[in-house]
Amino acid sequence: ATTTTTTHNSKNKQYLAKQKPVELTLGYQNPNGCKVCSFGSKGSIYQKVSSGFKGVSVMTDDKSTMPSVEEDFENIGILNVDSSLEPFKDHFKYRLKRYLHQKKLIEEYEGGLQEFAKGYLKFGFNREEDGISYREWAPAAQEAQIIGDFNGWNGSNLHMEKDQFGVWSIQIPDADGNPAIPHNSRVKFRFKHSDGVWVDRIPAWIKYATVDPTRFAAPYDGVYWDPPLSERYQFKHPRPPKPKAPRIYEAHVGMSSSEPRINSYREFADDVLPRIRENNYNTVQLMAVMEHSYYASFWYHVTKPFFAVSSRSGSPEDLKYLIDKAHSLGLNVLMDVIHSHASNNVTDGLNGFDVGQSSQQSYFHAGDRGYHKLWDSRLFNYANWKSSFLLSNLRWWLEEYKFDGFRFDGVTSMLYHHHGINMAFTGDYNEYFSEETDVDAVVYLMLANSLVHDILPDATDIAEDVSGMPGLGRPVSEVGIGFDYRLAMAIPDKWIDYLKNKKDSEWSMKEISLNLTNRRYTEKCVSYAESHDQSIVGDKTIAFLLMDEEMYSSMSCLTMLSPTIERGISLHKMIHFITLALGGEGYLNFMGNEFGHPEWIDFPREGNGWSYEKCRLTQWNLVDTNHLRYKFMNAFDRAMNLLDDKFSILASTKQIVSSTNNEDKVIVFERGDLVFVFNFHPENTYEGYKVGCDLPGKYRVALDSDATEFGGHGRVGHDADQFTSPEGIPGIPETNFNNRPNSFKVLSPPHTCVVYYRVDERQEESNNPNLGSVEETFAAADTDVARIPDVSMESEDSNLDRIEDNSEDAVDAGILKVEREVVGDN
């Protein structure tokens, strides 16, 4: 099946363990949220544990192995993972044949994939012992020169030579022992069309490009970047270990300032990275690193310098400083990479090398196939031998800048000849494996993922795909495409739909649960409630959808808490937390959403007078101002990330949804050995509410969204232990409570979520000083949170005096005094 109601991953990173089929009644929901048919008949699928919809746990054999594609051509590993793919075996064999053929050619003529991806050492400008070499692939050019500041933009004495493969080259000797082209000087590639016209273009492999900020719509110039040793940034810190599960902070450096201007790499490193680390994220995903001439394109339209950092925020050395600073804080750094298309620009884009030649002599396809109608951009010819340009691009970012992996943008457009345009994928496998599948692009992605993991085995590659392509997140050794994770893109769409179109009473607990668990359990997903997409002008963030204009007038703790703000803060916490806890094996949040930033992004453009006023998304003063309620959402974000850090929620393969009670508006599930209780009812408080669990024993509160530290009312007692009672007849699951062999009772206030952990009494009795403390979950979140009391928690009369007398004093946080015990598979 393309989707299941649970997700689990083999502990073996390479191969899925052998599994037994189970019978399960499914409600079908396709991966990108389109409304499709459903089926109620029983179907045989594979899964490790039940979902709460009467599935049965199965045994696994983690010792199973699978031969590589080179060892056994007939054994297509992915078919052993999903037998439903068997009818498409010929497609996978063809894919494998193409992949192996391409790889063999690369090994035969280039010495292997890693050597093939060293194009930046041959092409573009490279410093040699006694001069500078420059090479450019431009087979359609009739003549070529190199021009720049160094020769007064006169290339008459620097004509280049062309070889049989269309590569132009020149050696520029040193002058008096110094490079003929000074560091940081402007350069361009000048060539003549077949019709005799000369044009100037930015070199395709240039490492840096700048624009004159004093000239409106000035063209970009390539820059020869070769700083002296004293000016080169030297990395000081090693890459941190790859996290068990990524908690990703998606960020745009340029708009990270509180001021209406473009922020710099160094300012981001010094001012923003510590905030990210403080909120317990372990990964930063940087947008808009690749140079793009039009700022408002949000970096999607990459121009010529695919190898160049965006000069708006600083130099290459500044970006290296940022990444090294992130590594020193224990943060992995991923880069948004655009290999799905390129800007249509001619003067400063790779498109400027296309002068009507065939696709064999171009980076792009010719004709309609080389043009994306919706994006107004050019499409790469991935079968061209010059795919080394893109593969080298990946190696360059990994080795020169020490990135730890990539988020590949627009993968859906790459996978299909129709690019996903006007397609509503229903989950029918015929939609994924047909003549519409672009096998050239699939093979390129397989090579790309192989390369990245060959260079950096602990790299993280994430695919942005809305189609739900089966095998996207399976290893290349199984004839999968090789990504480590895929984005769970249907989740934010569902939340936005609920917030825009449904009353609280209309929220379906089963639909929410299905949407969050609707993924291929053998392929890891990164879940998110919102990303940069929801922050762009014309859309709204979750916080703004919940609280709208009241965010501008009712967020002060010095005023009474309005119903809108109370509901908004409560649901903001719940939506993000259940997305993390149930939605995938990784989690992502966009800059500012951790504290409910109210504004949207509006890049400078003609329609707003080229203003940067709305292009400074993160107004940090909102969360730094202690009497504003934004601090509560930020504190909870910090705490839920820390909870995952302690209990490995995202990395756990045990995920069981035991109850989706639509009447009560309550969802109960287990992840690892934690029990989660989400009460989405806007009014009802449930006392003695019975929840099922796996293991017997004593349970305590690990995290409580209603705690005062998080802007709640503090209604859930944290000192009382909850003891389980056995349910049903041992060994007969259908006699249990919600298919769980044990249960305990809790207090569940409206619009709250509470997490319970099982106490290991042996460790408790030993008073082990090395045990982590759940207290830290609250203490870390409470830092600078409770200085100004929220007057809505007390009577109006008592608050007036308290605010006046104690507004500058810290108050007790009431932090939990609970030790954390590691139990089960955690």
UniProtKB/Swiss-Prot annotation:
Its EC number is 2.4.1.18. Residues 1-58 form a transit peptide. It is found in: Plastid, Chloroplast; Plastid, Amyloplast. It is an enzyme of class 2 (transferase). CDD domains: AmyAc_bac_euk_BE, E_set_GBE_euk_N. Expressed in roots, leaves, stipules, pods and flowers. GO terms for biological process: glycogen biosynthetic process; starch biosynthetic process. SMART domains: Aamy. The keyword Lyase does not apply. GO terms for cellular component: amyloplast; chloroplast. The active site is at D409 (nucleophile), E464 (proton donor). PANTHER family: 1,4-ALPHA-GLUCAN-BRANCHING ENZYME, 1,4-ALPHA-GLUCAN-BRANCHING ENZYME, CHLOROPLASTIC_AMYLOPLASTIC. Monomer. This is 1,4-alpha-glucan-branching enzyme 1, chloroplastic/amyloplastic. It comes from Pisum sativum (Garden pea).
